[in-house]
Structure formats: structure tokens, C-alpha cells
Amino acid sequence: MVRYCVRSLSERSHEVYGQQLRGQEQGHHGQEEQGLSPEDVEVYERTHGHSHYRRRHCSRRRLHRIHRQQHRSCGRRRRRSCRQRRRHRRGCRTRRRRCRRH
């Protein structure tokens, strides 16, 4: 998982606007980062607590698809192997049994 996250300009402007509304001084934070190279900014953000894990928000459709795949994946594998065996052998000789996961 990636430890740092580069924010877009729009997110940065919202953050600065929110700080100005709250009355926090934005000067020292902005001036320190301006004189640093991109690599140093990355290190600075990591060491000064501005880093966070990049999270991918899952949609309901994506979660549903992943959940379905977990249940059906083992059955699909067994069916595919049986189809391949039918080509070469006279029948599927594997016993029909449920997946051990369920």
C-alpha cells in the first residue's frame, strides 16, 4: 500500500480556504514547502504527519462483484477442469462435493 498521497490543486485550495476561515496561520506551513524540491516535499510531508494511506472507495456494485467472485470462484475452477478433461477422457471422474469454504 502506498504511504504518501499527492493531493490535487483543487483539494489543496479547499484546504487553504478552510484554514483561513478557521483563523489558523497558513504562512509558516506554505513557506516551508515552497523552498523544497519535490523529493524533499515528499519526505517533509511523511515526517511532519501530513501523509495518509491512499484509500480507494468501493462502490456497491464493485463490492457486490468481489463478494460474488469469492463464492463462485472455486466452483468455476472445478467446472473448467471438468470440461477440459471431457475432451480427453470419457467423463468427469471427480466427485461432486461442495467447496470447503462454505
Swiss-Prot record:
Keywords, alphabetical: Chromosome, Developmental protein, Differentiation, DNA condensation, DNA-binding, Nucleosome core, Nucleus, Phosphoprotein, Spermatogenesis
Gene Ontology cellular-component terms listed: nucleosome; nucleus
Subunit structure: Interacts with TDRP.
Natural source organism: Hylobates lar (Lar gibbon)
UniProt similarity note: Belongs to the protamine P2 family.
Coiled-coil residue spans: none
Molecular function via GO: DNA binding
Biological role stated in the UniProt entry: Protamines substitute for histones in the chromatin of sperm during the haploid phase of spermatogenesis. They compact sperm DNA into a highly condensed, stable and inactive complex.
Basic residues composition bias: residue spans: 49-102
InterPro entries with a match to the protein in the record: PRM2
The protein, known as: Protamine-2
Post-translational modification: Proteolytic processing into mature chains is required for histone eviction during spermatogenesis. Transition proteins (TNP1 and TNP2) are required for processing.
Pfam family, one: Protamine_P2
The organism's place on the tree of life at top rank: Eukaryota
Sequence segments annotated as region (Disordered): 16-102
Residues modified as Phosphoserine: S8, S10, S37
Location(s) in or outside the cell: Nucleus; Chromosome
Record lineage: Eukaryota, Metazoa, Chordata, Craniata, Vertebrata
Tissue expression pattern: Testis.
GO biological process, one term: spermatid development
